[in-house]
Amino acid sequence: MSFDLCTIDWTAIGSIVTFVAMIIAYWTIHISDKQNKSNQRLQLLLVQRDIEQKRLDELVENIMIINDSMQPIVVTDYSVKLINGIFTEDDRHFIDEMAANDLANNNRLSVQLIKYDRKESAKKVLMTLSNMRRKYGEWIRNLSILNLYKSSFVISPQDLNRMILTMVQISKEIAPEYKKDIDYVIKTKDNDLNKAINLMNIFCYVISTYLNEQKKIFEEELYAFVKEEQKRIDNIVFHDSIK
């Protein structure tokens, strides 16, 4: 078979070649566009993961600051010092510093509760911590008030009475088994200062025991929460990128 170049329709062949070239060009652009979109999605997922990781790290850091500030041994030691009349000026300054830190921790905790109000797993951990901090804060305030009243009588009897009522309420709430001992102190004919000192003896033990028990529960809850959150964050890129 022989071909006559003059009889070949070069225009038709040129159209076919152009069409094929257009298909190749379109496919190349399509693949490139798909890769670009995939890369963009990957970048967005990486940014999302970094943001989530920073949020978790910030939350855990704030939680640990608050948790570490509440030491049961401190509650016992400084209460015993005050009860036994060996509370020094340095001790007073230390308690004042603790009170300032507790106020800062309360504000820090309030911010975290606002941020995680809609996230139940985080909120559960924060509420456990909040309950501990509230009772620990009451101990700090009561110890400060009792020291002021004992050393200089600079607070009113009404404030002293409110402090007594607070210690009674919290002690019975946490450790109802001490109700009989608490009622015995209240019914004695001692003055309010001596009643408050005797109640502090019970109150400090109740608070320190409560903190020891709650810290174990809290730390288990925190560990479980962080484990699940970290797993979720680590899977952001892997699971979402293959969808």
Language-model region placement:
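Amphipathic, membrane-active segments
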Residues: K37-D91
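Intrinsically disordered, low-complexity serine/threonine-rich segments
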Residues: T18-I24, P72, V154-I164
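Intrinsically disordered, low-complexity regions of eukaryotic proteins
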Residues: C6, T11, H93, M98-A99, ...
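Short, solvent-exposed segments of well-ordered alpha helices
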Residues: T7, N39, Q43-E61, K119, ...
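Membrane-embedded hydrophobic alpha-helical segments
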Residues: M1-L46
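Structured catalytic/translocation cores of nucleotide/phosphate-coupled proteins
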Residues: S15, M22, D57, H239-K243
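An amphipathic alpha-helical interaction surface
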Residues: E97-K243
